[in-house]
């Protein structure tokens, strides 16, 4: 099996990626970065792939007749609600989009990667998979869950040349961050980070682009935090 992976790498590495949530923010930066490296990137929109509807995921996979070497599970939702008042609908919808839909995509694409002897999976997690915050119980639980799913992928598909990891960003300057915070609030967030600023989406994307490349030949089953030192304090 190792010979198959080396042969694929020497041929130029991965050639096609599927990136969810690629319309903006980290997902768009990842997709753009991969395309700049000559990789064909599939960027399904919600009309094509609605992660909140299991049947939509199944239909998308059925219609996908292209080889996918790279899967970046970036799309997710976060609807803050305190534990005591957390609704069943909020909990269920968060787990569906952030966990179950990703599991379905993995179940559909991993056998194809295994058959090719090469695959790279990265799920975008969060520092809140590792640190609790008021109102984030559904979101934090979903991110912790997807990290465990990815570790299982690493164990079960490692023998077939598939490496799977999570990247857990801290505060990132995405469109949503700007929409939800004024200048004073952004400064307050930056002061909580040892490096004194929030990350740019491109800083997350450049690491993911390396992690899914053939240059990464051994890192798997990990959750790598990119937070400017936030979790250290």
Residue ranges and their predicted role:
Residues 82-83, 90-95, 177, 189:
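Substrate-binding pocket helix/loop in short-chain dehydrogenase/reductase
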Residues 158, 163, 219-221:
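Short, small/polar-rich loop/turn modules that mediate ligand/substrate recognition or access, typified
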Residues 23, 31:
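N-terminal Rossmann NAD(P)H-binding glycine-rich loop of SDR-like oxidoreductase domains
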Residues 118, 197-226, 231:
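C-terminal substrate-recognition "lid" of short-chain dehydrogenase/reductases
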Residues 106, 142, 150:
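Active-site helix of classical SDR
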Residues 111, 155-156, 217:
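Alpha-helical segment proximal to the catalytic Tyr-Lys
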Residues 126:
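Residue(s) in the substrate-gating loop at a strand-loop-helix junction
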């Amino acid at each position: 099996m190792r010979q198959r992976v080396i042969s694929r790498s020497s041929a130029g590495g991965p050639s096609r990626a599927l990136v969810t949530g690629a319309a903006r923010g980290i997902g768009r930066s990842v997709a753009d970065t991969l395309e700049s490296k000559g990789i064909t990137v599939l960027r399904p929109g919600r009309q094509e792939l609605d992660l909140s509807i299991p049947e939509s995921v199944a239909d998308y996979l059925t219609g996908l007749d292209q080889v996918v070497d790279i899967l970046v599970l970036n799309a997710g939702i976060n609807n803050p609600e305190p534990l005591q008042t957390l609704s069943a609908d909020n909990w269920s919808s968060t787990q569906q989009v952030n966990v179950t839909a990703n599991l379905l995509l993995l179940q559909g694409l991993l056998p194809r990667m295994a058959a090719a002897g090469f695959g790279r999976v990265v799920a975008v997690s969060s520092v809140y998979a590792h640190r609790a915050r008021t109102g984030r119980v559904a979101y934090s639980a979903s991110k912790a869950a997807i990290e465990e799913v990815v570790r299982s992928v690493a164990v079960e598909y490692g023998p077939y040349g598939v490496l799977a990891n999570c990247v857990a960003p801290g505060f990132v300057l995405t469109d949503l961050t700007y929409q939800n915070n004024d200048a004073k609030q952004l400064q307050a967030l930056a002061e909580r980070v040892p490096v004194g600023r929030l990350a740019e989406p491109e800083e997350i994307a450049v690491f993911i682009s390396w992690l899914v490349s053939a240059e990464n030949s051994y890192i798997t089953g990990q959750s790598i935090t990119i937070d400017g030192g936030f979790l250290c304090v």
